[in-house]
């Protein structure tokens, strides 16, 4: 499939590369065409700028996402981000990724960021496969990459690309106050749970994914907090005989895509109506029960976090991210919900005359803010 001075890349199937190339051939466009290969972890204003600059130089531009799931955001999320971020271009097609371009098979050093003789061999293999198979299948004459002033490995890859594929064009990275806009800076902000800082450099259509990421991260942090007497933690079931750490973790993963959808609803100039929020919430609840085979692991958390996700996404869209506006949005959303009847929680509220999850939301969580 590919070769470098010190290695060859082979596969034991006649369908793998051929199948992917047939897929790429089905996407071919007339005129001068080019391609951008990106990880998009997550899709930033810098990625959008690269696509914008590249698309202006060709009749049609293809964007291929790195398929390997070794990133903060999953491949499917990154693919969705790229499609949303590139939707405003008439001459851009976002393509499915494959194991044949910047993957653990062709270029594993990319994911550990260590430059070595082995890494150079891997880069040459990856680029040889691109030049021999992927570029001809798409019919592209140019490959566009962003300049890389700080990452030695990626910079070396770009320089080798210029040698292997003459149609390589390096585009200067977008900067903000002399600082290069990078996905790594966004990830650093997310690692420190700095929402506003993270959203500063992501493209607007990426914001819902950032909000959802932090919502899911919060649920995982709560689960991993150990010990928690009476509650499920990493070492104990607590008072819950029908659930454990693994089941709770599975439930959180099942809920995550719905946090993206809820944040997308909220990321608009007006708050979404309650019925739309309820519909997504009901789908999320169904997915949770499917993942846990009927165990209620996060129904309450889904309600509270779901409302918060919508409110925070709306605050980011309207540039009103502060405690008072977010509380206002939470209360406004909660007021559209009616009290449940016929549940254990509803019976407890009736007997003991205490406030439940909905009442706390309507009051914008006074115990938290």
PLM regions: where:
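Catalytic-loop motifs flanking and including active-site residues across diverse enzymes
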Residues: 182, 251, 301-308, 364
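Long, hydrophobic/aromatic-enriched structural stretches that serve as scaffold segments
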Residues: 257-310
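Short, well-ordered, mixed-charge alpha-helical segments that flank or form enzyme active sites
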Residues: 151-155, 177-180, 304, 311-313, ...
């Amino acid at each position: 499939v590919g070769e470098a001075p010190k290695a060859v890349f082979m596969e034991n199937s006649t369908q793998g590369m051929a199948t992917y190339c047939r897929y790429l051939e089905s996407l071919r466009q007339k005129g001068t065409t080019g391609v951008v290969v990106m990880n998009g972890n997550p899709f930033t204003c810098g990625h959008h700028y690269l696509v914008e600059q590249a698309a202006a130089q060709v009749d049609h531009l293809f964007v291929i996402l790195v398929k390997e799931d070794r990133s903060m955001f999953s491949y499917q999320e990154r693919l969705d981000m790229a499609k949303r971020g590139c939707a405003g271009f008439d001459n851009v097609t976002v393509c499915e990724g494959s194991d044949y371009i910047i993957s653990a098979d062709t270029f594993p050093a990319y994911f550990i960021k260590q430059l070595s003789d082995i890494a150079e061999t891997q880069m040459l293999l990856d680029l040889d496969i691109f030049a021999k198979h992927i570029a001809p299948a798409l019919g592209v004459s140019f490959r566009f990459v962003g300049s890389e002033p700080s990452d030695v490995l990626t910079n070396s890859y770009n320089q080798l690309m210029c040698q292997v594929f003459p149609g390589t064009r390096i585009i200067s990275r977008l900067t903000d106050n002399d600082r290069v806009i990078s996905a790594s800076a966004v990830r650093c902000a997310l690692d420190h749970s700095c929402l506003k800082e993270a959203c500063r450099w992501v493209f607007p259509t990426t914001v819902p994914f950032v909000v959802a990421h932090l919502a899911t991260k919060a649920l995982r942090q709560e689960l991993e907090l150990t010990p928690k007497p009476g509650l499920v933690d990493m070492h104990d079931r607590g008072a819950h005989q029908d659930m454990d750490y693994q089941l709770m973790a599975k439930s959180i993963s099942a809920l995550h895509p719905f946090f993206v959808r809820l944040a997308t609803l909220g990321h608009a100039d007006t708050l979404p109506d309650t019925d739309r929020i309820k519909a997504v919430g009901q789908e999320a609840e169904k997915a949770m029960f499917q993942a846990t085979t009927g165990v209620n692991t996060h129904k309450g958390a889904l309600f509270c976090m779901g409302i918060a996700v919508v409110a925070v996404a709306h605050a980011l869209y309207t540039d009103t991210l502060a405690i008072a506006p977010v509380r206002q949005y939470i209360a406004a959303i909660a007021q559209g919900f009616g009290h449940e009847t016929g549940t254990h929680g509803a019976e407890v509220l009736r007997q003991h005359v205490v406030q439940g999850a909905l009442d706390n939301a309507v009051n914008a969580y006074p115990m938290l803010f």
